[in-house]
Amino acid sequence: MKIAMLARNPNLYSHKRLVEAAEKRGHSLDILNTTRCTVNIASHRPTISYNGETIKGYDAVIPRIGASITNYGLAVLRQFEMAGVWPLNESVAIGRSRDKLRSMQILAKYGLGLPLTAYANDPKQAEEIIKAVNGPPVVIKLLEGTQGIGVVLAETMSSAKSVIEAFRGANVNILVQEFIKEAGGTDIRALVVGGKVVAAMKRTGAADDFRSNLHRGGSAQLIKITPEERSTAVRAAKHMGLNVCGVDMLRSNHGPVIMEVNSSPGLEGIEKATEKDIAGQIIDYIAANAKAGKTKTKGQG
């Protein structure tokens, strides 16, 4: 099987592991720098060029699109889809997952556990939305942020209002969420492949940091999740339409609450914490499911 991966950095652990796992199973996997792909739009002949040459012959594509090039990356992925190449995660599902508000709206629609969340455009409504999520304290997030960037814990009404006004003054969109104190600076990352949780880890934030992202200096360890947490992760992946994703949850007093569904989860932390060959499971899933022209939109919204 011939697989393409849309990614800018071939040296990332996740990307090297996917190449290794594919080659170990007798497949070829080419890493294509997303920004060097050119989309050629013509009736009945959707093509993609890479470094000036037309791309052809791929059975599947793995999108590992960086947040900073989401729109361009999704345009390239759509072109692969229109050419009949099977995507590990579809463009419409990735687009959903990159919009935190849209993700929350979809998950809420299906009754999945979420932290109290509010969204408003007018900074004059700051106090109203802080109270709507039982704050302060509150967590304020950029809609487009990743890896814990653009996430602020505001512990007083005045600091929360100041942060909201500053973000809105910079004309960026934000969510305001309740602070789940009982989580104690830890969260759970459940990795879903093909509708099953294949691995889970507990992430703990660095000292004096409520964010548990590994990119922010947090640590990870193996954890046994509850049946409710497993079901929550599987349902989140299903309703977001994602074949592979990382579902980040907090343990609250009223059960698991979803913080984010990541459509391009890193493999290093979870493979090392669990000692599982997750890259291999992803490649096996592709080999079992990739068929030419088998692209259809899943999920709602």
From Swiss-Prot:
One Pfam family it belongs to: Rimk_N
The residues that hold Mn(2+) 1 are 248, 260
Residue positions binding Mg(2+) 1: 248, 260
Q: Start and end of every ATP-grasp domain? A: 104-287
Positions contributing to Mn(2+) 2 binding: 260, 262
Cofactor binding note from Swiss-Prot or TrEMBL: Binds 2 magnesium or manganese ions per subunit.
Q: Which sites bind Mg(2+) 2?
A: 260, 262
GO MF terms held by the record = ATP binding; metal ion binding; ribosomal S6-glutamic acid ligase activity
Span of the signal peptide: none
As cofactor, the record names: Mg(2+); Mn(2+)
A single GO CC term, please? Answer: cytoplasm
Q: Where does ATP bind?
A: 141, 178-179, 187, 211-213
Q: Does the record bear Zinc in its keywords?
A: no
Identify the SUPFAM superfamilies for this entry.
Glutathione synthetase ATP-binding domain-like
Keywords from UniProt, A to Z, are: ATP-binding, Ligase, Magnesium, Manganese, Metal-binding, Nucleotide-binding, Protein biosynthesis
InterPro entries found in the cross-reference section: ATP-grasp (IPR011761), ATP-grasp_RimK-type (IPR013651), ATP_grasp_subdomain_1 (IPR013815), RimK (IPR023533), Rimk_N (IPR041107), Rp_bS6_RimK/Lys_biosynth_LsyX (IPR004666)
Q: Which HAMAP family match?
A: RimK
Q: What is this protein called?
A: Probable alpha-L-glutamate ligase
What is this protein's gene name?
rimK
